[in-house]
Amino acid sequence: VHGSRGLGDVYKRQILGTSHAARNYPSVAIEIQNELGIQGYAYDMLVGCSSTTFAINNAYSDIASGLANTVLVINPEISTPFVNYAKRDIHFIFGDGCVATVISNNKKSNNQYKILDRKLITKFSNNIRSDWSYLVRAASDEKSIEDLLFYQNGNSVFKEVCPMVAEFITTHLKDNNISPSDVSKFWLHQANSRMVNLIVSKVIGTDDFDTSLAPLPIEKFGNLASAGSMFAFNLHNDLEKGDKGIICSFGAGYSVCSICLLYTSPSPRDP
């Protein structure tokens, strides 16, 4: 970051989305903004494992409204310090990572994806929860450190989220007159391979599909919380001009965001 001053000439807005905030204030986004020399505004936002896609949605909205031309979206996910290592069903799959995405109305890039549509939904659930907060100091019921860490009811999450996300993506495609068979890639939240494969099979109507349709970088990097779907996108975006893809996150909240993309690059991409 310290070696990147001058980027303020390119980026005027910056959004930081993460499922785990490093602190309440000053905003980490504003600290990064200062180091990069970005003018305008920056802010943090938290929407669980949909923090990255919700931040991209906000960036798109800012550009569409005329508030900005280019927005830098940064999504650090450092989950491992927040995990209870005494509970294997919770800790074993998490990893740490960070992604950055440039959202712009600049049509001159030789590697560009057009956002065709976004669809978002939230539905309250305690099945994925953390009570870590400054309010703990004033709470009437004392809790141990273990009580404040990441918690999930995995079986309930699987049973409730999989059909919810599959129906959500299916509806999103119908809203845009896109057949599931016309989707070249599904870049989904990297919760686990079982959830990803089940959701995709429900959307396309069969569990007999090429594994490249729904990339699984989780096998190497683990569950990277809200950064996972963009890790999948970055590592497996071998589309041709005119191909469509779906980025979809889902997680604590519950929160779900589906982003429909069209690859529009006019020339071969750089290696």
Features from the language model and the residues they span:
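Short acidic, glycine/serine/threonine-rich loops at helix termini
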Residues: 25-27, 57, 82-87, 256-260
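Condensing-enzyme catalytic core mediating Claisen C-C bond formation in acyl metabolism
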Residues: 87-159, 163, 167, 250, ...
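Claisen-condensing/thiolase-fold acyl-transfer catalytic domains that form or cleave C-C bonds
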Residues: 20-21, 39, 47-64, 166, ...
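Short beta-strand segments
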Residues: 17, 46, 71-77, 103, ...
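Conserved beta-ketoacyl condensing-enzyme motif
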Residues: 4, 8-48, 53, 173, ...
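Flexible, glycine-rich active-site loops centered on histidine and acidic residues
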Residues: 67-98
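Single conserved hydrophobic/aromatic residue that forms the stacking wall/gate
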Residues: 1-7, 11, 263-271
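Conserved active-site "lid/cap" helical segment
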Residues: 4-12, 85, 135-184, 195-199, ...
